[in-house]
């Protein structure tokens, strides 16, 4: 048996799952290594492609985003009912976990050591996804869990709870993985001087550990400030007030910088009328901050996503789309402008669309590798009535839409099965 299959089956047994995985190379004899020079869509069973590409193209992916089935049991365009009848440790969730395990395993193999994966999920399978990810990627490589508001009023009435959020679970391939950070919020910069827009970020007097005068004696010195303008300088001058880094309890502390640094960067300091010295934080178009774990933006809401789908396709051909701005924000925070991005539950193709928009905005060269099923669409679904016969037809239609609107966007289609 193939080594990958052995590893997956070992993981499955350790988790207490009932599945047994087999690797069939016959289906992949015509599969070429990953072409990272263009965007691509692989049509068919994503597991087949993942297991092949993890062999031919390991460590090629910079970032992976997926929006897998949530196992809701709802009748939507794709199969979303993998509730088991077994009575093992995971009960109803066994089949869903067994479905995702090999796919996540191969995605892990495809990621670079610096790679990152982000997965959308809701309450029903969050805990079980976390177990899978901890096992495959390692608990130490858990980066964070982002709570994403998906609607204003929420949905459902179970026990008088209206769920208005879902999650974005983020892991790195190794300790070398690092988020790009989210763009700073320019609206927070409420002051301006000749050097640009700025905000007051924190006191210039050191707090906490190693903040005493005795810790760094050379960082205890007087500053001189103008109470009318807030300007601060190191040299004394007639009419200026003097301030030392002494706190409200009379404890002698120290400044953040040496006297020489404060002299060179005095333009970055600001004093209040009562002599509290602060550091100015200037705005920059390239500035990044740590990714926050709560995202509440109306442009991320499901309603916005549905409106976008309706505008592009003429009707709601996909039941569970993600908003374009939401996927753009994920990619922008977690991947570099030249990233190769994998989405093996491509759905309505939003990931490719988001990457194309970002490239047009910042001159990036992001490429997307998509995978989507060629499963037939039921005749009663609105997508069938709109002319689509397979789920992948919707994805390809979105890619054509992107190509029509972004001339630099090109893609190729791979279907070997």
Swiss-Prot record:
Keyword entries, A-Z: Methyltransferase, Restriction system, S-adenosyl-L-methionine, Transferase
InterPro entries: DNA_methylase_N4/N6, DNA_methylase_N6_adenine_CS, N4/N6-MTase_EcoPI_Mod-like, SAM-dependent_MTases_sf
Signal peptide stretch: none
Gene3D superfamilies associated with the record: Vaccinia Virus protein VP39 (3.40.50.150)
GO biological process, one term: DNA restriction-modification system
Presence of the UniProt keyword S-adenosyl-L-methionine in the record: yes
SUPFAM superfamilies: S-adenosyl-L-methionine-dependent methyltransferases
GO molecular function: DNA binding; N-methyltransferase activity; site-specific DNA-methyltransferase (adenine-specific) activity
Catalyzed chemical reaction(s): a 2'-deoxyadenosine in DNA + S-adenosyl-L-methionine = an N(6)-methyl-2'-deoxyadenosine in DNA + S-adenosyl-L-homocysteine + H(+)
EC number: 2.1.1.72
The UniProt record lists the keyword S-adenosyl-L-methionine: yes
UniProt similarity note: Belongs to the N(4)/N(6)-methyltransferase family.
Protein name: Type II methyltransferase M.KpnI
Organism of this sequence: Klebsiella pneumoniae
The encoding gene: kpnIM
